Regions:
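N-terminal hydrophobic/helix-forming segments and targeting peptides
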Residues: 1-360
C-alpha cells in the first residue's frame, strides 16, 4: 500500500488500485491495464476473450452456482485522427467528454515506442472575439501539442490511431478520499479482483467465482457481452460508479441520496434481478455494511444492461461506488466506500449456496 497523507484519516491506497489508476487504458486500448490486472490475479485460473476481456476464476465444484462479478477496465480517452504539417495532433473522443475539461490539460499519447507527453491547446482567450468567449469550446477547435517542429518530427513519435489520456496521477486528499483519472472504472475492476482474492484466502465459498475485467464499456457495453458468453455464469453483478450526491449541483431528487461514506449503492429497478438485489441487500444488512439503494426505471447504462440480456438471460445485480466529478481527470472517491464494496462482494459470494433461487 501507499501511505496516505496526514489528513487522510488513516486510509491507504491499495497498491493494485494505484497501479491500475496510473496505467493508460482507454476503450479499445486496454491492453496495458488488463495486463496489470491479470498479473495480480496469478492465484486464479486466468482466461481472456477475443475482445480483450480478462477473466479470473476460482472454485472447481461444477455443481455449484457460478457468479460473475464484472468491472470494466476501460476509461474515456482520445484517439489521434490527424497530424498536420506543423506537427500538431488532432483527435476524436473515446467515450463521453465535457470538452471544456480538456483545455490546458497535460496529456500522454501512447506512441510508437512508448509514452509521449503533450498538452491540449486551443486559441488563447486573448485572441477570441467577444462572441467566441461566450461559447463552449468544441473538440474540433482543439489540438494536442507534443512540441514537435513539423509533421515528420511528430510522426517519428506518434501515429494516427494512437490513444491519448489526460496526465493525472492519483492524489490523496483529506478525509480518506482519493483523486485520479480513470476511477470510472478501474474501481470496478479492482473491486472484482480484490473480492476474488479475499474469497480465495477465506476458502469459505460454496459457489464458483469469476472476476471479470471487461473492455469497451464506455463505447457501448461491448466487453461484458462477450465475457458473459465466455464465462456462462448463473448470475452476475456489475460493479461501477455512480454520482456522489454530496457535491454541489447534484440533485438528490434526480439520483437519490448516495453521499461519501454511505457505502456501496445497490441497484434496484426494471432491468435488474429482484432476487440478486435481495441477496445483496440481505448480505449487507447481515454483515453490518452501510449501503444505499439506487433505483432506475430504465437502462442503468452500465455493464448490467448487457449482462442481463446475454445468452438466455442472466440474473444480474448492480453495485455502484459514489464518485464525484465523473468523466474528468479529478474523479474523487472515498476509500472507505471502496473497501465496503469489496467486503460486500466478498460476503455475497461466500454466502451463495447451491440451489439458490434466482427465478424472477
Amino acid at each position: 500500500v501507499r501511505p496516505a497523507d496526514r489528513h487522510n484519516r488513516g486510509m491507504e491506497t491499495p497498491a493494485l488500485l494505484d497501479t491500475l489508476l496510473r496505467t493508460p487504458g482507454p476503450s479499445g486500448y486496454e491492453r496495458d491495464a488488463a495486463r496489470v490486472w491479470r498479473e495480480a490475479a496469478g492465484f486464479a485460473e486466468i482466461t481472456t476473450d477475443g475482445l480483450g476481456g480478462s477473466i479470473a476464476t476460482i472454485g472447481d465444484d461444477e455443481g455449484a452456482p457460478l457468479v460473475a462479478v464484472v468491472g470494466h477496465i476501460d476509461e474515456i480517452g482520445l484517439v489521434v485522427t490527424h497530424i498536420d504539417e506543423k506537427g500538431f495532433l488532432y483527435f476524436e473522443p473515446i467515450g463521453g467528454w465535457d470538452p471544456q475539461i480538456l483545455v490546458g490539460q497535460r496529456v500522454t499519447v501512447t506512441g510508437n515506442e512508448g509514452s509521449v507527453p503533450g498538452v491540449a491547446g486551443r486559441k488563447p482567450i486573448h485572441l477570441l472575439d467577444p462572441e467566441q468567449r461566450k461559447k463552449v469550446v468544441k473538440l474540433k477547435e482543439m489540438h494536442i501539442d507534443i512540441g514537435a517542429d513539423d509533421r515528420e518530427a511528430s510522426q517519428a513519435l506518434v501515429s494516427v490511431g494512437d490513444p491519448v489520456v489526460i496526465d493525472a496521477e492519483p492524489m490523496a486528499v483529506a478525509s480518506g478520499r482519493l483523486v485520479s483519472r480513470s476511477m470510472d472504472n478501474r474501481l470496478g475492476s479492482y473491486v472484482a479482483l480484490e473480492a476474488l482474492r479475499r474469497c480465495h484466502e477465506d476458502s469459505k465459498m460454496k459457489a464458483r467465482f469469476a472476476a471479470v475485467a471487461a473492455v469497451q464499456e464506455e463505447i457501448g457495453l461491448f466487453g461484458s457481452r462477450t465475457a458473459a458468453f465466455t464465462v456462462r455464469p448463473d448470475l452476475a453483478v456489475a460493479i461501477d460508479v455512480t454520482h456522489a450526491t454530496d457535491a454541489p449541483g447534484v440533485d438528490e431528487k434526480e439520483v437519490g441520496s448516495h453521499p461519501f461514506g454511505s457505502g456501496p449503492v445497490i441497484g434496484r429497478g426494471s432491468t435488474l434481478s429482484p432476487k440478486v438485489y435481495e441477496l445483496l441487500r440481505d448480505t449487507a444488512e447481515a454483515a453490518g455494511i452501510s449501503y444505499s439503494v439506487g433505483a432506475s426505471g430504465n437502462a442503468t447504462h452500465t455493464d448490467a444492461d448487457s449482462l442481463q440480456i446475454s445468452r438466455t438471460g442472466i440474473p444480474t445485480g448492480l453495485v455502484s461506488i459514489p464518485l464525484r466529478y465523473m468523466h474528468s481527470p479529478v474523479e474523487m472517491v472515498d476509500l472507505a466506500d471502496v473497501e465496503a464494496t469489496v467486503e460486500l462482494i466478498r460476503a455475497f459470494v461466500n454466502g451463495l449456496e447451491p440451489g439458490v433461487d434466482l427465478s424472477r
